[in-house]
UniProtKB/Swiss-Prot annotation:
Catalyzes the attachment of alanine to tRNA(Ala) in a two-step reaction: alanine is first activated by ATP to form Ala-AMP and then transferred to the acceptor end of tRNA(Ala). Also edits incorrectly charged Ser-tRNA(Ala) and Gly-tRNA(Ala) via its editing domain. Its EC number is 6.1.1.7. It comes from Bacillus velezensis (strain DSM 23117 / BGSC 10A6 / LMG 26770 / FZB42) (Bacillus amyloliquefaciens subsp. plantarum). PROSITE patterns: AA_TRNA_LIGASE_II_ALA. Coiled coil: none annotated. This is Alanine--tRNA ligase. PANTHER family: ALANINE--TRNA LIGASE, CYTOPLASMIC, ALANYL-TRNA SYNTHETASE. Its main location: cytoplasm.
């Protein structure tokens, strides 16, 4: 067997299947694009669902990829086992209705055993098949020549995710030798059993059935192949190491951690776990941040926060008690640079994000640990082995402890966490709810007439908004029809069209189709699975027929607004990078005729001054009258030019490059102005945060910007009228009114203070003597808690030595304030305990220091009773 690096194995896999006629699908972003069913891309097939379910027909039905993936369902096992990871790479070859079992099995065996490729000894390979999959069994036994004793039938060899495509699978296992298991009595010592000797290196799924809603299975019209090979696992076999962490994918990170910690890997099992956790988690976080995710308290951002804080916790085992994870980013970038250059390109930004998060956690870690230690001690003293949900939530909400981190500390003390209680607290704090994602099926059922339409349709709308065309297909409710009549809702495909189909954030065009017999209003345009533009509309009059000649005309005013807004988003994107930093990336957009919406990654708020600069830059570029050039270029040439790619989009070998002078350069398939002067004016309407690390700007251009500014001027004029002022004097008038208001508030405070003194003086006659101590417990008039506290302070000063508790009713609620002079504290009198006693009577709570405390209550009618209970408490102490 050859010794290969991880980079060589990855490239060898892609090259092998490229030779077999497969198209190499680039690794997609870890952040799913337009797939609400996934938090992360979690497999090689996840990014190909659109091909498997028929929404899009691939140019080549044979696909191969190396896909970065994240799975977080078993984080607690990472570092404690040989092969659990949160970030990993899946190598896979796929067939969308092309080849099937024979080719998949034959090629897998060739790749693994041929000296040209991996070069495994065939005698060390075994396979598993489903008991009823006779075809796969026969192929392994007769075509490949695997001995029957190394073909194991396992009931679990069936891939099924519920409704949708499913089928049997076959797995290939490598025998690592007797040093990993040689006990004849071990019932799990076989390929497919729970053991370390026989390692699964490849899983081939034969998707040949549809799992129907009623639980039955029917054959698929087009059978698919979906295979998966974990790169880390495969490399561990090739490099002959005991765990994935000992491969060249992880060891440079572990070695860097050794240098930081001064500790050694491979000497102590507990410390080895820490090294592994750190190595795994920094890979995940670095790649996720490079793809636009940022630490937060919800969704995927919460996963990153949890991983970083788990790593910090384990780092303490190695004696590391400072931010350090960010120092490992260049190491991760260096390992993966050959295939994933994005981490290296963004390593400064990634390191900054990680360092900021580490510093934030270190600030609260020690305080949080002290609180947790007290909680654990308290529960143990009570004889309890459970940390309450309230305490877990407090640690999460106040100190940033993920519940899983608290759970790990609890396990160290042989305690458990009250998860139900924690979830109940989370429910009360809905704004901190982690994520409520749509429950969307991960695979749709094959089918639909649109998928089978292969007739070509040409888009001519970049240069024209009107064209003569022929109807090549008509559909109603997803079914092909030959004609449609007045009032019918239809989908129409033309041989050529000026109508843009919704994509890249730009909405589909609206307009009209006219034939000699019919008029059809087009309300929207979308792309069919094979790329044609599907015109959705209603027959206004007459009858439209398949084969009819039509004049297709886009609503000119609508398109005019769209192109202005689309080019403006390109200018805005570059302006954001100029002002906020190069880390800014597009995270989504919407371009309509009336306005534009642009979502972008940024981990801080955008200040008013920054927004003004951004808006100013965009308008300067508009007024410079810059020509907009659009060219088709090879993808590599476009990238070398520095063209920005859109978030989540995938591109072919030839791409459309939109260039605004020397200012903006993007890959884009949308419609644009020919010169920035056509945009006229750009005005930001709003800027806000829409999620962890993602901001949104909404803006208008041209006529819309003019109307927006007029609206703002009208509002300003209305304010001036109300203030009885000129528009230009509005700021001065407001400042003058604010000064008058402050003066009135000061006078009000002074009057209230005087009234308070009067009232305080008036109630001095109500002081009681209890056991030689002056006691005053009275209901008073006070506007708020501050006023009440001031009265208590004044009375303490007047009486010299006294216990005072005052109560007031405000807005149907009770305020209580208590004070004890220093000389009486030594006698056991305590303002906090006294006010707590009173508050409980009127349905509230509170407390404070021995000399000063406050509380609140819900039942004003019980205030007198509450004050009486305070007096009783004083008597009990004295």
């Amino acid at each position: 067997m050859k010794h290969l690096t991880s980079a060589e194995v990855r490239q060898m896999f892609l090259d092998f299947f490229k030779e077999k006629g497969h198209a190499v699908e680039p690794s997609a972003s870890l952040v799913p694009h337009e797939d609400p069913s996934l938090l992360w891309i979690n497999s090689g097939v996840a990014t190909l669902k659109k091909y498997f379910d028929g929404r899009v027909v691939p140019e080549n039905p044979r696909i191969v990829n190396a896909q970065k993936s994240i799975r977080t369902n078993d984080i607690e096992n990472v570092g404690k086992t040989a092969r659990h990871h949160t970030f990993f790479e899946m190598l896979g070859n796929f067939s969308i209705g092309d080849y099937f079992k024979e080719e998949a099995i034959t090629w897998a065996w060739e790749f693994l055993t041929s000296e040209k490729w991996i070069g495994f000894d065939p005698e060390l390979l075994s396979v598993t098949v489903h008991p009823e999959d006779e075809e796969a069994y026969t192929l392994w036994a007769e075509k490949i020549g695997v001995p029957e004793e190394r073909i194991i039938r396992l009931e679990g060899n069936f891939w099924d995710i519920g409704e949708g495509p499913s089928g049997p699978n076959t797995e290939i296992f490598y025998d690592r030798g007797e040093k990993y298991g040689n006990d004849p009595s071990d019932s799990e010592l076989y390929p497919g059993g729970e053991n370390d000797r026989y390692l699964e290196v490849w899983n081939l799924v034969f998707s040949e059935f549809n799992h129907n809603p009623d639980g039955t299975y029917t054959p698929l019209p087009k059978k698919n192949i979906d295979t998966g090979m974990g790169l880390e696992r495969m490399v561990s076999v090739i490099q002959d190491v005991s765990t994935n962490f000992d491969t060249d994918l992880f060891m440079p990170i572990i070695e860097a951690t050794e240098r930081i910690s001064g500790d050694a890997y491979g000497k102590d099992a507990v410390k080895d776990t820490a090294f592994k956790v750190i190595a795994d988690h920094i890979r995940t976080v670095a790649f996720a941040v490079s793809d636009g995710a940022l630490p937060s308290n919800e969704g995927r951002g919460y996963v990153l926060r949890r991983l970083l804080r788990r790593a910090v916790r384990y780092a303490k085992t190695l004696g590391i008690s400072r931010p350090f994870m960010y120092e490992l980013v260049p190491t991760v970038a260096g390992i993966m640079d050959a295939f994933y250059p994005e981490v290296k390109e963004k390593q400064e930004f990634i390191a900054k994000v990680i360092k900021t998060e580490e510093e934030r956690f270190h600030e609260t870690l020690n305080e949080g640990l002290a609180i947790l230690s007290d909680v654990i001690k308290k529960e143990k003293e009570k004889g309890s082995g459970i940390i309450s949900g309230k305490d877990v939530f407090k640690l999460y909400d106040t100190y940033g402890f993920p519940v899983e981190l608290t759970e790990e500390y609890a396990e160290d003390e042989q305690m458990t966490v009250d998860h139900k209680g924690f979830e109940a607290e989370m429910e009360k704090q809905r704004e901190r709810a982690r994520n409520a994602r749509q429950d969307v099926g991960s695979m749709q059922v094959q089918g639909g007439a649109l998928r089978d339409i292969t007739a070509e349709s040409t888009f001519v709308g970049y240069s024209a908004v009107k064209a003569e065309a022929k109807v090549i297909e008509l559909l109603h409710d997803g079914q092909l029809i030959s004609e449609a009549h007045e009032g019918d809702t239809v989908q129409i495909l033309l041989d050529k069209t000026p109508f843009y189909a919704e994509s890249g954030g730009q909405i589909g065009d609206r307009g009209v189709l006219r034939s000699e017999q019919a008029v059809v209003t087009i309300k929207d345009v979308k792309k069919a699975p094979n790329g044609q533009h599907v015109h959705e509309g209603t027959v206004d009059s007459g009858t439209i027929q398949k084969g009819a000649s039509v004049t297709a005309e886009v609503e000119d005013q609508m398109r005019s607004g769209v192109v202005k807004n689309h080019t403006a988003t390109h200018l805005l994107h570059q302006a954001l990078k100029d002002v906020l930093g190069t880390h800014v990336n597009q995270a989504g957009s919407l371009v309509t005729e009336n306005r534009l919406r642009f979502d972008f990654s940024h981990f801080g708020q955008v200040t008013k001054e920054e927004l003004e600069r951004i808006e100013g830059i965009v308008n300067e570029k508009i007024w410079e009258s810059i020509p907009v050039a659009i060219d088709l270029k090879p993808i590599n040439e476009a990238k070398e030019m520095g063209a920005m790619a859109l978030f989540g989009e995938k591109y072919g070998d030839i791409v459309r490059v939109v260039q605004v002078g020397d200012y903006s350069l993007e890959l884009c398939g949308g419609c644009h102005v020919t010169n920035t002067a056509e945009i006229g004016l750009f005005k930001i309407v709003s800027e806000s945060g829409i999620g962890a690390g993602t901001r949104r700007i909404e803006a208008v251009t041209g006529k819309g910007a003019y109307q927006e500014m007029n609206s703002q001027l009208s509002l300003l004029q209305h304010a001036a009228d109300e203030l009885k002022s000129n528009v230009k004097d509005v700021p001065k008038r407001i400042q003058s009114l604010q000064a008058e208001l402050k003066e009135a508030q000061r006078e009000n405070e002074s009057l209230l203070s005087k009234l308070g003194n009067v009232e305080a003086g008036a109630i001095l006659s109500k002081v009681k003597d209890i056991g030689g101590v002056k006691v005053l417990a009275e209901k008073v008039n006070a506007k708020d808690m501050n006023h009440l506290r001031t009265m208590v302070d004044d009375l303490k000063a007047k009486l010299g030595s006294a216990v005072i508790i005052l109560g007031a009713v405000q807005n149907e609620k009770v305020n209580l304030s208590a004070g004890v002079t220093k000389d009486l504290i030594e006698k056991g009198l305590h303002a906090g305990k006294m006010v707590k006693q009173a508050a409980e009577v009127c349905g509230g709570g509170g407390g404070g220091r021995p000399d000063m405390a406050q509380a609140g209550g819900k039942h004003p009618e019980k205030l007198e009773e509450a004050l009486a209970s305070a007096v009783d408490w004083i008597k009990s102490v004295l």
